[in-house]
């Protein structure tokens, strides 16, 4: 919670003054106040920016956290209204109360204090401090206290702000009027009781579709709902171009990845380079990241043979891309399932394996297995690791369902080892495949 940068004595004095002068404008309408010339009353741009920033910072500091708190934007028209109301110096004007301002559904926070005692920033901070006396769970303020400044300040659906101040005279003393206007207004009542100003929950978890962005300043952890800067809520790095309609990054030469964040500088010694994955597809008989290693087929590691191809099921778990690299180091690829026959045999084998095979790495997250199929955003389709288009499919019911976020495919145990799209950082066991044409050219291993 923000506290004004004042001495303890001064802070206590401010609190006492607030209690004495009242916390609602209706309580401080002394008839002797007279309007003075507005020479120094209007806020300049710097003051407007500071007040707006403070409001948003305080709104993102509420406890419990707010799930639907909107970010406020400055409104010059509201600032003009606030300035005009401050110039009334507390005098009630029925025509304004019942006319245009009520039609606009504007909410008000207003304060009269001795001139020069506090800054506008300190006044707003003191409004927020009323929250110490407010119970969100009960939806009410402490007995004999008022929290209406606080509840309006943190009213979740208010999205526009404008403030003004004015110097008024009261006999020998000078009084300063501070006013902030909020739209849409808050502090609505049901059956005589003010409803809670916001919904409790994780920051930005209940933002509406029109404000689905989540604004976070650098110096705090809270979040405020805002109109998204782009509907994709993402940006492309390294001078990549974002296609707003497809939410895909078009990367410049030498970069790849969902956000063009991966620099591609590989040289494939015995193989071809796949720019979209920044990886090598090795020639027969070679493996490793750059296809520079001569490999030998490890016959003793074949778990099953299907139509001459060898399939090896790992006893360890890893992320998708690390699993793919481990298969390539051995001269193979992550399994490519291109027929119902291969799918049926693997599903049967893995089902039996669940109760018989030992796992040396107990840190795996699921009982699922990676295969060599990934979603390519640039092509808007799933492709095998070799770049081939996926013709045969065995996705489980309702899959794929991650819409570009689960880009890697696993055999899912809970779905009888049919396919599921999953986040590539998930740790699974995996299946390496050694094709028949590869095996025929490899020399015997040691």
Curated annotation (Swiss-Prot):
Record's subcellular location: Secreted; Endoplasmic reticulum; Golgi apparatus; Endosome
Glycosylation site list: 144
Keywords: Disulfide bond, EGF-like domain, Endoplasmic reticulum, Endosome, Glycoprotein, Golgi apparatus, Lectin, Secreted, Signal
UniProt domain EGF-like: residue ranges: 228-261
Any Pfam family the entry gives: Lectin_C
Domain C-type lectin: 306-433
Reported impact of residue 421 to N: Has a mild effect on polysaccharides binding
An annotated Gene Ontology molecular function: polysaccharide binding
Gene Ontology CC entries for this record: endoplasmic reticulum; endosome; extracellular space; Golgi apparatus
Disulphide bonds in the chain: 236-249, 251-260, 327-432, 408-424
Tissues and organs where the protein is expressed, per its UniProt entry: Dectected in all cell lines tested and in peripheral blood cells.
Residue ranges annotated for the SCP domain, each copy included: 52-182
Top-level division of the source organism's lineage: Eukaryota
Keyword Secreted: yes
InterPro entries: C-type_lectin-like, C-type_lectin-like/link_sf, C-type_lectin_CS, CAP_dom, CAP_sf, CRISP-related, CTDL_fold, EGF-like_dom
UniProt PTM comment: N-glycosylated.
PROSITE patterns documented for this protein: C_TYPE_LECTIN_1, C_TYPE_LECTIN_2, EGF_1, EGF_2, EGF_3
UniProt signal peptide: 1-26
Purpose: Binds polysaccharides in a Ca(2+)-independent manner with a preferentially binding to fucoidan, beta-glucans and galactans.
Xref: PANTHER family: CYSTEINE-RICH SECRETORY PROTEIN-RELATED
Listed name of the protein: C-type lectin domain family 18 member A
Organism: Homo sapiens
């Amino acid at each position: 919670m923000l506290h004004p940068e004042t001495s303890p004595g001064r802070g206590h004095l401010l609190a006492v003054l607030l209690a004495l002068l009242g916390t609602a404008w209706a309580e401080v309408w002394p008839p002797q106040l007279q309007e003075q010339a507005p020479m120094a009353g209007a806020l300049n741009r710097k003051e407007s920016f500071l007040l707006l920033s403070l409001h948003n910072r305080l709104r993102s500091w509420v406890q419990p956290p707010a799930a639907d708190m909107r970010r406020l934007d400055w409104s010059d028209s509201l600032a003009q209204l606030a300035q005009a109301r401050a110039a009334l110096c507390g005098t009630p004007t029925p025509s304004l109360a019942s006319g245009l301002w009520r039609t606009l559904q504007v909410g008000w926070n207003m304060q009269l204090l001795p001139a020069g005692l506090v800054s506008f920033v300190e006044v707003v901070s003191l409004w927020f401090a009323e929250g110490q006396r407010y119970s969100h769970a009960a939806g009410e303020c402490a007995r004999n206290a008022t929290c209406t400044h606080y509840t309006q300040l943190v009213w979740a659906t208010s999205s526009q702000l404008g403030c003004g101040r004015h110097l008024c005279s009261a006999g020998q003393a000078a009084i300063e009027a501070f006013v902030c206007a909020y739209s849409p207004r808050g502090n609505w009542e049901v059956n005589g009781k003010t409803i809670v100003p916001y919904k409790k929950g994780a920051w930005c978890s209940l933002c509406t579709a029109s404000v689905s962005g989540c604004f976070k300043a650098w110096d705090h952890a809270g979040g405020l709902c805002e109109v998204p800067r782009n509907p994709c809520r993402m940006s492309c790095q390294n001078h990549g171009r974002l296609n707003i309609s497809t939410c895909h990054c078009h990367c410049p030469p030498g970069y790849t990845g969902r956000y063009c964040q991966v620099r591609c500088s590989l040289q494939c010694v015995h193989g071809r380079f796949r720019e979209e994955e920044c990886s090598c597809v090795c020639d027969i008989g070679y493996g490793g990241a750059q296809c520079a290693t001569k490999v030998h087929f490890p016959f003793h590691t074949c778990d099953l043979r299907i139509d001459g191809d060898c399939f090896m099921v790992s006893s360890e778990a890893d992320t998708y891309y690390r699993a793919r690299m481990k298969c390539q180091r051995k001269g193979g690829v992550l399994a490519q399932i291109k027929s119902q026959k291969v799918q049926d045999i693997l599903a049967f084998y893995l089902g039996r394996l669940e109760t018989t095979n030992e796992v040396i790495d107990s840190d795996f997250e699921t009982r699922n297995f990676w295969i060599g199929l990934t979603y390519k955003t640039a092509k808007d389709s799933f492709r095998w690791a070799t770049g081939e288009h996926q013709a045969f499919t065995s996705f489980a019911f309702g899959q794929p369902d991650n819409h570009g976020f689960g880009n890697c495919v696993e055999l899912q145990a809970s779905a009888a080892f049919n396919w599921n799209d999953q986040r590539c950082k998930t740790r699974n066991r995996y299946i390496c495949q050694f094709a028949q044409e590869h095996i025929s050219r490899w020399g015997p291993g040691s």
